[in-house]
């Protein structure tokens, strides 16, 4: 009998083991779709980004008008730009849901997979930040100024660090040029890290909603889950297209329709919606260095989650107390997102500080305590 090329060819064999004959738990729910959706987001962003880069000029005097030119004069340029801008939002929606799934179902116990995932999140955030600066609108410029200025909070080397990042004494042409270079490079770094992430995942196999070993029950990925993934792709691309065609500017900032002007500060500087929770945590601390450390901690706290797992059960499926706490944490993140979009005045300052304290308290203190309590209740 002739050898099956899919199983014998050195390249096809790898594809086969990752996408076709991959043993998969039979009971994984739609929450396990977001990994592949993130893959589609990445491919979409790289393709639309490449097409945009062909018409973009990374120069302070031309950047804004080159984006306007793309939207007005390039064939379907408006569509490519809208897909790229809204694709970023969908990318973050998917990654936040993906992280939430991992948190709820204890997937973080695959430590290597989880840690590479956190590095991927940080890289994605960096990519989105430098990308937001490129259209060179008011919010692009002032967002870049405010966030890069945070490096000056580092003792002794701070100011040197900021000027080194800027390439001068303010956000100017060198800054824009290097941000464009980084925005072009980082997505390929994300693609490489994704392969490492998947390599670690396929070492252990997928987790499942029950959090139990399912080796004896596993089924091939194709056709069962490839079809399920395809449905996810269709739904997400439908949502992206609807967003790009009907309300392309819904998630953007109106300030960015004005070209960057270093002499006029916008009344309220704020990042895109997907960074608002971290921005609220940054602003809730009156000290500059403290704020920067809290901002870093808001994401890096994810690295501690595997070490704070005290429950004898892996997932939260049968742990109602932890479930309640999880949804309180989700609500708290929504509150932080809302606070980040509000001006710095009285009720919002206090609410932001309370929500920031709650965020860290839930993750670092309450989850381990509640998990231990549940162990006791269940006589473990």
Swiss-Prot record:
GO terms for molecular function: metal ion binding; ubiquinol-cytochrome-c reductase activity. Pfam families: Cytochrom_B_C, Cytochrome_B. Binds 2 heme b groups non-covalently. CDD domains: cytochrome_b_C (cd00290), Cytochrome_b_N (cd00284). GO terms for biological process: mitochondrial electron transport, ubiquinol to cytochrome c. It is found in: Mitochondrion inner membrane. The chain crosses the membrane at residues 34-54, 78-99, 114-134, 179-199, 227-247, 289-309, 321-341, 348-368. InterPro entries: Cyt_b/b6_C (IPR005798), Cyt_b/b6_C_sf (IPR036150), Cyt_b/b6_N (IPR005797), Cytb/b6-like_sf (IPR027387), Cytochrome_b (IPR030689), Cytochrome_b_C_euk/bac (IPR048260), Cytochrome_b_N_euk/bac (IPR048259), Di-haem_cyt_TM (IPR016174). Heme b b562 binds at residues 84, 183. Its cofactor is heme b. Component of the ubiquinol-cytochrome c reductase complex (complex III or cytochrome b-c1 complex) that is part of the mitochondrial respiratory chain. The b-c1 complex mediates electron transfer from ubiquinol to cytochrome c. Contributes to the generation of a proton gradient across the mitochondrial membrane that is then used for ATP synthesis. Heme 1 (or BL or b562) is low-potential and absorbs at about 562 nm, and heme 2 (or BH or b566) is high-potential and absorbs at about 566 nm. The cytochrome bc1 complex contains 11 subunits: 3 respiratory subunits (MT-CYB, CYC1 and UQCRFS1), 2 core proteins (UQCRC1 and UQCRC2) and 6 low-molecular weight proteins (UQCRH/QCR6, UQCRB/QCR7, UQCRQ/QCR8, UQCR10/QCR9, UQCR11/QCR10 and a cleavage product of UQCRFS1). This cytochrome bc1 complex then forms a dimer. This is Cytochrome b.
């Amino acid at each position: 009998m002739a050898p099956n090329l899919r199983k014998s060819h050195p390249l096809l064999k790898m594809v086969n083991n990752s996408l076709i004959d991959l043993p998969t738990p039979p009971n994984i729910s739609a929450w396990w779709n977001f990994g592949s959706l993130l893959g589609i987001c990445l491919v979409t962003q790289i393709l639309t980004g490449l097409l945009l880069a062909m018409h973009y000029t990374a120069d302070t005097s031309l950047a804004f008008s080159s984006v306007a030119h793309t939207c007005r004069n390039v064939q379907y340029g408006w569509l490519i730009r809208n897909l790229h801008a809204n694709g970023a939002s969908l990318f973050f929606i998917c990654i936040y849901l993906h992280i939430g799934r991992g948190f709820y179902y204890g997937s973080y116990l695959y430590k290597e997979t989880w840690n590479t995932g956190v590095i991927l999140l940080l890289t994605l955030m960096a990519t989105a930040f430098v990308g937001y600066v490129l259209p060179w609108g008011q919010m692009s410029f002032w967002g870049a100024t405010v966030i890069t200025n945070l490096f000056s909070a580092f003792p002794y080397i701070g100011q040197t660090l900021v000027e080194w990042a800027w390439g001068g004494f303010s956000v100017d042409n060198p800054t824009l040029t290097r941000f464009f270079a980084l925005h072009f490079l980082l997505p390929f770094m994300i693609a490489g890290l994704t392969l490492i992430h998947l390599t670690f995942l396929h070492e252990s196999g997928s987790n499942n909603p029950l959090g139990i070993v399912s080796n004896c029950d596993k089924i091939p990925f194709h056709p069962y889950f490839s079809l399920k993934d395809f449905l996810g792709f269709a739904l997400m691309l439908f949502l992206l297209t609807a967003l790009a065609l009907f309300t392309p500017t819904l998630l953007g900032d109106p300030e960015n329709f004005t070209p960057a002007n270093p002499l006029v500060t916008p009344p309220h500087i704020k990042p895109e919606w997907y960074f608002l929770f971290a921005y609220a945590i940054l602003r809730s601390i009156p000290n500059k260095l403290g704020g920067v450390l809290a901002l870093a901690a808001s994401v890096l706290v994810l690295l501690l989650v595997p070490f704070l797992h005290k429950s004898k059960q892996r997932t939260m499926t049968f742990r109602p107390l932890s479930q309640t706490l999880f949804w309180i944490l989700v609500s708290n993140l929504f509150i932080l997102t809302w606070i980040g979009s509000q001006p710095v005045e009285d009720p919002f300052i206090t609410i932001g500080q309370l929500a920031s304290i709650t965020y860290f308290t839930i993750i670092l203190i309450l989850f381990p305590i509640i998990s231990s309590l549940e162990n006791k209740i269940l006589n473990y």
